[in-house]
């Protein structure tokens, strides 16, 4: 995924009201940017460190800039825009980067499915094999050298796991794909200390046949891509 033009840079001052952040530019100007990450952003907020943002030319937007990436106090790059995870996953699948998800003829996005009024992030289809339902999650929480998901209690995430288990029961393939948007994360685990119900459900989903995958990203202000598989601890 190439970013044209590359993201602009500033220093984080503060995040507030969940969807806003104030950034100090190199010329001393202070701007307010939109924060597209609705999570807690635990261990992703480092005031005084570098952040990168994109700029929209849509005149109807109240805030023209969108927070895209952040630097941690250890120098790692974190993908803040969770909305990019699905596109990164789709691009990697189409490029054959995710070896477990090759060999399908069609890829569809945001397809309605399940009994709980859900939409699957990605659906792979082929005439000669079962459909493959893929739920994509952005993983950015790093604590004591370990990557975790989720960074806050997620009833929505629990619902998605139930839906994936149901797809397996119906004879389909179901995959939970963690897109690791943090260059310091090398392994992913369920955040049992944050959402024990999600952690338990993830174990149940794995035992029921849901495949759990994680792929790390290469991130820069000019490009982003999935590069390699990383272990998942259940």
Swiss-Prot record:
Pfam families, alphabetized? SfsA (PF03749), SfsA_N (PF17746)
State the disulfide connectivity.
none
- InterPro entries in the record, alphabetically? SfsA, SfsA_C, SfsA_N
Signal peptide extent: none
Entry GO MF terms = DNA binding
Family membership noted in the UniProt record? Belongs to the SfsA family.
* Cited PANTHER family: SUGAR FERMENTATION STIMULATION PROTEIN A (PTHR30545:SF2)
**Which NCBIfam families does the protein's record reference?**
sfsA (TIGR00230)
Full protein name: Sugar fermentation stimulation protein homolog
Q: Which organism is it from?
A: Shewanella loihica (strain ATCC BAA-1088 / PV-4)
